[in-house]
Amino acid sequence: MANYEFSQVSGDRPGCRLSRKAQIGLGVGLLVLIALVVGIVVILLRPRSLLVWTGEPTTKHFSDIFLGRCLIYTQILRPEMRDQNCQEILSTFKGAFVSKNPCNITREDYAPLVKLVTQTIPCNKTLFWSKSKHLAHQYTWIQGKMFTLEDTLLGYIADDLRWCGDPSTSDMNYVSCPHWSENCPNNPITVFWKVISQKFAEDACGVVQVMLNGSLREPFYKNSTFGSVEVFSLDPNKVHKLQAWVMHDIEGASSNACSSSSLNELKMIVQKRNMIFACVDNYRPARFLQCVKNPEHPSCRLNT
């Protein structure tokens, strides 16, 4: 038998060892991969810039003001609505425009809000206005039984506030919001007022009133909210008469009255929709409010 010599074998199995050059290359590749992943994470987590607009931003402390007005209205002014959930109303309101491009808001975005907040206005108690907001609000406040849109819950809450969102954040935009002149008609404020104005008109019944500014060249302005939305949203099956109160500034010129071409245009629209139209120049109860600041004016004399 042949004699064989066996050499001692190490306990470790022989393996394929990378060259130093390959190890360096692998390390560099791993570092590049880590850097790439970190870079992507940083980009994704970095706050994106807000869209820049020329209009005023969301009103400061918006949510606090919203909730405060809601509570005042439901708990003090109209306690019959005390069961309304103000937090839910705020959340639903924000859901219409937060995290969205403020120029792409639709009527459907506010549909959940309109469905959530229901309010019944008594027949014969609806007062629309156009270019006469201050006097109309004075009148309903003193009269106590009539409602402008801003005397309803949603109108009261949103009156004179500004708001918008941005696609890059779940918060409201407190830096800037679109101005109506920026070719942005579908902004959250404009769409909101159109939606609730339409609902306000659709719900009206009996005899309705509109207060117009007779000191303007066109007391009835077709492009106003009343002229483009509300008058066409009245339901002739529920509203049988519209009365226009054409109010002139006491110190201004009374260049337009119920016989003007502007009011005749409104009359034609109303009558074509099978409703009765009536017009009063300087409706006396509202005139008295104007006379509070100008008691000596000739038009404020009792025999005038």
Swiss-Prot record:
A molecular function (GO) term: NAD+ nucleosidase activity, cyclic ADP-ribose generating
Catalytic activity: NAD(+) = cyclic ADP-beta-D-ribose + nicotinamide + H(+); nicotinate + NADP(+) = nicotinate-adenine dinucleotide phosphate + nicotinamide; NAD(+) + H2O = ADP-D-ribose + nicotinamide + H(+)
Subcellular location: Membrane
Topological domains, Cytoplasmic: 1-21
Domain of life: Eukaryota
Keyword Calcium: no
Glycosylation-annotated residues: 104, 124, 213, 223
Disulfide bonds: 70-86, 103-184, 164-177, 258-279, 291-300
InterPro entries (alphabetical): ADP-ribosyl_cyclase
Tagged with keyword Nucleotide-binding: no
Disruption phenotype: Loss of cADPR and NAADP synthesis.
Membrane topology reported for the UniProt record: Single-pass type II membrane protein
Active site as annotated: 123, 205
EC number, UniProt record: 3.2.2.-, 3.2.2.6, 2.4.99.20
GO annotation terms (biological process): B cell proliferation; B cell receptor signaling pathway; negative regulation of apoptotic process; negative regulation of DNA-templated transcription; positive regulation of B cell proliferation; positive regulation of DNA-templated transcription; response to xenobiotic stimulus
Family assignment from sequence similarity: Belongs to the ADP-ribosyl cyclase family.
Protein name (Swiss-Prot/TrEMBL): ADP-ribosyl cyclase/cyclic ADP-ribose hydrolase 1
Organism: Mus musculus (Mouse)
